[in-house]
Curated annotation (Swiss-Prot):
Single Gene Ontology BP annotation: lipid A biosynthetic process
Induction of the gene: Induced by iron starvation conditions. Transcriptionally repressed by IdeR and iron.
Protein name: Acyl carrier protein MbtL
CC terms in the record's Gene Ontology section: cytosol; membrane
Biological function: Acyl carrier protein involved in the formation of acyl-S-ACP intermediates within the mycobactin biosynthesis process. The aliphatic chains carried by ACP are subsequently transferred on to the mycobactin core by MbtK.
Amino acid sequence: MTSSPSTVSTTLLSILRDDLNIDLTRVTPDARLVDDVGLDSVAFAVGMVAIEERLGVALSEEELLTCDTVGELEAAIAAKYRDE
């Protein structure tokens, strides 16, 4: 499975905007998922499903919860691509 960093980033932004109704003006690589972006446990669950459906990458709950920022989440997704 291959994907470029820009594809991961673009798709993640799309998920945040379309699936989670996040205002993308609040989203930067350093934005904290909970404090800055405003994700809660329901949003994390919806996000996990959307990431798997759109990117074909299954993140465990543990992997997702270790991501504090948008950039860390992008890196975790990209790492899954490298591992597969």
